Amino acid sequence: MLLSRKLLNTLFPIFNKVSNQELETMLNSIGVEVENIIKFPRTENLIVGEIKKVEKHPNADKLNICEVFFENKIHVIICGAQNVRPGLKVIVAKVGTKMLDGRLIEAKDLLGVKSNGMICAYAELTTKTDVCSYDEIENIIELDNDAKLNDIDPLKYIGLDDEILDLSVPSNRNELNGVIPIAYDLISLYFPKSKIDFSLKNIENQKKTSIKINIDKELCRFFGVIDVSNVEIKTSNWKIKSFLLNCGITPINTIVDITNLNAIITSVPCHAYDKDKLGKEIAVSLNAHKEKFLALNDKEYVVENKSAVSVISNNKIVSLASVIGSKENSISNSTKNVLFEIGNFDNMAIRDASNKLGIKTNASTLGSKTIPLWITYKSFDYLIGLLKDLNIKVSSVNYVGDKLKDNLIDFDSQTIQDLLGQKTDVEKNLKLMGFNFVGKKVKAPVYREDLENISDLVEELTKKINVNNLELKPIESSFVDFEFDNFEENWNFLEKYFINKGFTLVKTLNLTSLENNKAFNLFGSKKSIKIMNPISSEREYFRNNLIQQHLEVLSNNYAHKINLYNIFEIQGLNYDGLWNKHLCLTLPIEHFNNKINNSKIVIDLLFIKSILTDLFNVFNIPFEIKAIENLSNDIEFISTNNGFEIYVKNKLIGIASQISPEILNKYKLDSSKPIYFVELIINDLLDSKISKSITVSDEKKEHNIARSITLSLDRNQNYKKIESVLDNYKNNLNLLDKFEIESVFIKDNKPSYTFSLEINPSKLNKKETNEINEIVERLIKDLINEGAEIKR
């Protein structure tokens, strides 16, 4: 699904102050993944002008001499578009404008007449022309009347100031292909004090149309028609056209565009007929006999007997329900009276008809999955209101449908808390999310047919538990009463901390397969929690780790030739009856550290140790590093010889390692390039007080560079010689601000020492990574000469 930020903000102004990053996090929390954010390239030096006069060019039949008024004077511009006429407000590229295709607009002579600028067509201002009609490509833009003369930001009038989110929607939430259902979910979760209006006011008190409706209730849960008379078929205004173009739909005319816009907003397919070509009765059933059908795509299909849910009038198929309409009954320039249709049809029958006939449309994609009945009623109601807003008079309506019923779910607070693994006021939180209580049952929001049992309620509460504080208003209450005084503050601090260090924040899904939980069971989880109605076997258990889905993220990006980044995630995971908070860093590339002259740092365990040293120092928590010894034999993705375990108070809280090449091959990543990760259980960090006064901001300053060196000695080796080498570097090189033993551990009867050092970049000559590495390599060489074995 393509979600227009501008459309979302227009319909629900509460999202105006939500950034794209915040919105992405919010969408992830309801199971919607943001695949990409599309921003339109901008052409500068544009202005809104008004055509005052048009004359034919004396030396060219297809060119027009236009007098265009802007900046308080008339400018002569030669234009070949056939729709130029006096009174139009247009977008002008002034002399000196560089167009997206590289052309430079110059004042030049065209067959004896000097042209001073260019009047723009839509296709000249965007790189996304695949859904443009002839009008957007060949004709100049005819701006709506509200465009202001001399406005130097005219792109907003044609939607090119929009941002488009390419979304992947859960298969069991088909309604989330509409703007309204997405907004309902987000508002109930993030803006609990903002009331959602679930009324269907527009349906009420409408005159009933004379057209009779008969439906097969096994195939159709709702069928409604809206009768509109004396319409004018013309090009839509730019408010409608821009939303369609930005969502990948070609504008056609006012009526057809309204049906497509309504589907974008509500997720329900909509169709329009030339009413004068229909009979006085409409039926919905399987087609009664074999029939040839000329569709809107100008292709003829043979519809076999009883093979497709059909809308029938005058004993003919007038549309294949939620697939495609007939050419014979379609809207044309001569249409005067229109009948709009919205239905809720059997999704399996829609899918079968679409597959058998080989017809794939936006409608069939939506119709082949379940759409909640209330959403269909809402779509019908919204369409009536939309027509009124566009000054299109509704003559009458008629509909037949199943009665809307409350979705009541058995409720047990203690069972829910046991599944959550955390104490919380379940009833209060569910009420804030739009649920109500009827006796011992909980009533789901009217549009949530997908919720069936306690496990579904747990999943809804889990979304809120995993919601990070985005500091959005009017959020004033927390859904979960965390025991940690510093929890939210520290969680937010950690996100900003790692973003400031050059990592990219990701959010991944909380459900996975049992196989993945076993293969990536870093911390010896004994019990994976299974949900009762999983979408698939790949998403039926709460996960016990983050790294597995990080590999999926990298694999997906690599397959689509998207640049890889060093990523991190902070998330709560539900396993072993506890709610454990995890932090995972995954590092597939050299780390870009623009604090020091755009240098790059090679990723290895030394770098990870330096990151951990900084992190734990911030929280004043001592930690210890040990060799990897406690992993299950099922954990094959870790290179045990190139990794370590992290302990706090003798308790394993983390693992850092290179990922094995075999696993990289499995995920179709480049196994010739090492990928490292570190995953921590950060309950203690979130419960701690930050010990240092640290400000995390976007400002890039020079910070000390941390490095760690681990060496081991035989029992009979003289540590004094090693100490003298270290003292020499510590005392004689004034660029070291810190040099101390970080940890000591024993493996294979050999003592191992980890030293941490901090280099002050302001004392370097070239301030380059090479100089830093040379110092470290020189130190390592001297240590090796004294018999030390360096752990790389």
From Swiss-Prot:
Subcellular location: Cytoplasm
GO aspect biological process, one term: phenylalanyl-tRNA aminoacylation
Recorded superkingdom: Bacteria
Sites where the protein binds Mg(2+): D450, D456, E459, E460
Keywords linked to the UniProt accession: Aminoacyl-tRNA synthetase, ATP-binding, Cytoplasm, Ligase, Magnesium, Metal-binding, Nucleotide-binding, Protein biosynthesis, RNA-binding, tRNA-binding
Catalytic activity: tRNA(Phe) + L-phenylalanine + ATP = L-phenylalanyl-tRNA(Phe) + AMP + diphosphate + H(+)
Protein name as annotated: Phenylalanine--tRNA ligase beta subunit
Species in which this protein is naturally found: Malacoplasma penetrans (strain HF-2) (Mycoplasma penetrans)
Gene: pheT
